[in-house]
Amino acid sequence: MKKEFNLIATVAAGLEAVVGREVRELGYDCQVENGRVRFQGDVRAIIETNLWLRAADRIKIIVGTFPAKIFEELFQGVFALDWENYLPLGARFPISKAKCVKSKLHNEPSVQAISKKAVVKKLQKHYARPEGVPLMENGPEFKIEVSILKDVATVMIDTTGSSLFKRGYRTEKGGAPIKENMAAAILQLSNWYPDKPLIDPTCGSGTFCIEAVMIARKMAPGLRRSFAFEEWNWISDRLIQEVRTEAAKKVDRELELDIMGCDIDARMVEIAKANAQAAGVAGDITFKQMRVQDLRSDKINGVIISNPPYGERLSDDAGVTKLYAEMGQVFAPLKTWSKFILTSDEAFESKYGSQADKKRKLYNGTLKVDLYQYFGQRVKRQEVK
């Protein structure tokens, strides 16, 4: 079994720096690239990063990299890799994905088929199985991916399974919810800290509020779910349980939090409450049915984070314009509060009524969105009577 692995955390565009910071906080040196963060680590690193990374999509093992301009080079390159260190006899190993960009090899189904053939031949040789007899694939699954960029192939195994945004607490979702990992990333990009009040005035299924509590209380986002690697025979159940137990002990239950989520839709408020209950944070969040225009607060130095309906989520432009204008009017008196608003509407600032201090381009799935950032006037608490 290998002791050290070349690993990558895949990331949505625009969030790479957040994931890089998370990887470093776990104690691993890393290299931030477009769409991914590279790092090295042992089996424990595979477990820890899956369990703890809030803003990443998946953790993958890089099995190898080699030039591949023709199919024979692809076959020989895949065949040369040390598959015996990963795939036990009986393993299922679908070539689940092939991606070819700016390369001579561009037929992705053919890349999948040839890669599969090469892995089969290597395992038949290693396990002394006759070539004419198909390998039985009835054991744990190892999803293999092949990426060819500028004629260089990278072959990977996915350790995660379902994407990391699937935390295991979402009982039901709204029409177009923000993904949990993106919500966690935006919270980390904001200037919110656990000692500040936090309000999501368009909370939907409660994702921002739930992720905020999990960040504040140091709750590992992967504690309530399982991962692909847990089925693999070379990662011991004992080590997995040890890392999970360590994570559970780090939860900080003492912290006092001031987090509120509001939505105009009573049904969404109930869904948000159920999700918070499933996440184990129901006691930390106040959920209310309330219109945006009814939001008031006499607290200071708070943070508003909102993913209001936009694009396909609101069918009429008039409704969008009215909502954004109301947000601008209601948030304006909250001068010490910072506001972070995510939308794909490029005319947001004119509808809201003021220009953002900063704007950050992100992707909510495949949809390009902007995070409009308005920074509050910071005052010391004793200055306010």
Language model segments and positions:
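Non-catalytic nucleic-acid substrate-recognition regions in nucleic-acid-modifying enzymes
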Residues: 2-142
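Short, charged/polar, Gly/Pro-enriched secondary-structure boundary elements
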Residues: 44-51, 162-165, 380-382
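C-terminal edge-of-domain segments
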Residues: 144-160, 372
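SAM-dependent Rossmann-like transferase core, predominantly class I methyltransferases
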Residues: 155-189
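C-terminal catalytic and target-recognition region of SAM-dependent MTase-like enzymes
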Residues: 290-385
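Conserved S-adenosyl-L-methionine
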Residues: 178-296, 312-313, 317-319
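A short, flexible beta-alpha/helix-coil linker loop
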Residues: 100-103, 162-163, 309-313
